[in-house]
Amino acid sequence: MAVGGADLDIPAGSFCGLVGPNGSGKTTTLRMVCGLQRPDAGNAWVCGLDTWVAQMEVRRLLGVVPDPLNLFDRLTAREWLAHLGRLRAMDAGEVRRRSEELLGVMDLTDAADEQVGGYSHGMRKKTAIAAALLHRPRVLLLDEPFEGVDPVSAVAVRSILDRFRSAGGTVVFSSHAMDLVERMCDHVVVMSHGTVLAAGPLREIRGPGQSLEDTFISMVGAAPTDPSLLGWLGGDDG
């Protein structure tokens, strides 16, 4: 079972970080919320709409960066954004204006007419983030949005997400970078083995005088280490 008994209520307008070890169910949770994966039981609601009853309406409300990324490799970044604009019946001129601004902020302008299939992982991730923002959604669901993104672009992305949130948008993103979540988020969800261990405002989840990483390790447990193993790494051949 990838996820079981997950009961989450993420307030509108919040910046929520979803954290957990590899295989904890973060990606599955995001996929169920956005309608990419149907749960065996239970419901997912976005802005008061059931994801599986009002699928088209929910998709209009969401901007999603899934894992793995869902891009058309034979299209250029500029073509990909134009294609998404047509699918959403957006005004062509507005799509061009927004696309150029997004490509510029993501430092993709010089590569905008190259096929996405030739992009690095970080460039593909930035293209996906631009695509998620294009239609100005109300909620962003981002699976590891900063993975593989260079530090300069990461600062730009954080600035964009802060601006999106300050305008009333809701951001939910998964990450293994505890310091990043602690710096950006006001809410946090801690998962392990498909179960939600804690969820709520960051200030309440984080222990007194502890970092989020300290709290996370105390909840999830540190990986066991046997000092008798891997002695050869220190030059001890046994």
Region roles according to the model:
Residues 82, 86, 93-111:
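Conserved ABC ATPase "signature" region
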Residues 34:
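Helix-to-loop junction immediately C-terminal to a conserved catalytic motif
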Residues 136:
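Conserved catalytic motifs of ABC-family nucleotide-binding domains
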Residues 181-182:
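A short, surface-exposed alpha-helical micro-motif characterized by mixed small hydrophobic
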Residues 199-200:
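ABC ATPase "signature
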Residues 140-143:
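Catalytic Walker B motif of ABC-type/P-loop ATPase nucleotide-binding domains
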